[in-house]
């Protein structure tokens, strides 16, 4: 039991660092429970796609993806408690009408991977939603994205909904998502599926 409590504490510590920190605690089942998503994020349907979006393939990064226009880059460093090291955080984001399209990532210390991909992915998602006060998790589901461990998610806050996937590539944790008005879910679905599919990570 002691080992289980410690691993949960370690996961909370990891996710607090990764996504900005929150006040609160979680029971063990909160990290393993899944909720079915209302639609398949990886299945494109009829409707407008991303054919006119531009390929974003920066030389300094280990991924490529398609954006509706040139994204802005935000870079931060999060301090690791009791360590001189920091976690780098990068986000590439742009807007297209009422949609916000984003790819973000951080690089984890190698020894954190011993806690397992599912624990890292689900814990990170829990903290992401909890950090957005008033947000509701519609669904989350573990998956495999192009051979990498992944977690699909959908949550909403007010009249805005966000859907996407977390992908763990080696020790790099990516978040690929689109935020859009709730009433436009059906119209955005095709673009969302194609945007996620356009994401091509590599281990560098």
Can you say where each PLM-predicted feature lies in the sequence?
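A short acidic-to-branched-hydrophobic micro-motif
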Residues: 89-120
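Long, charged/polar, surface-exposed segments that mediate recognition or autoinhibition
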Residues: 108-133, 192
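Extended beta-strand-rich segments in extracellular/periplasmic secretory proteins, especially
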Residues: 147, 151-153
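N-terminal targeting sequences that direct proteins away from the cytosol to non-cytosolic compartments
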Residues: 2-89, 96, 131-137, 142-145, ...
């Amino acid at each position: 039991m002691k080992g289980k409590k410690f691993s949960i504490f370690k996961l909370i510590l990891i996710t607090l660092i990764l996504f900005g920190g929150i006040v609160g605690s979680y029971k063990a089942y909160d990290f393993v429970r899944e909720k079915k998503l209302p639609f398949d994020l990886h299945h494109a349907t009829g409707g407008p796609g991303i054919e006119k979006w531009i390929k974003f393939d920066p030389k300094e990064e280990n991924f490529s993806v398609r954006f509706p226009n040139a994204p802005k880059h935000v870079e931060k460093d999060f301090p690791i408690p009791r360590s001189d090291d920091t976690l780098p955080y990068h986000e590439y984001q742009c807007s297209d009408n009422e949609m916000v399209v984003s790819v973000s990532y951080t690089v984890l210390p190698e020894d954190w991977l011993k806690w397992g991909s599912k624990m890292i992915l689900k814990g990170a998602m829990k903290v992401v939603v909890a950090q957005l006060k008033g947000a509701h998790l519609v669904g989350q589901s573990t998956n495999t994205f192009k051979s990498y461990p992944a977690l699909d998610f959908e949550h909403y806050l007010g009249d805005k909904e966000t859907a996407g996937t977390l992908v763990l590539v080696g020790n790099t944790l990516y978040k690929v998502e689109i935020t859009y008005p709730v009433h436009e879910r059906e119209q955005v679905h095709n673009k969302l599926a194609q945007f996620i599919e356009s994401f091509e990570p590599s281990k560098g």
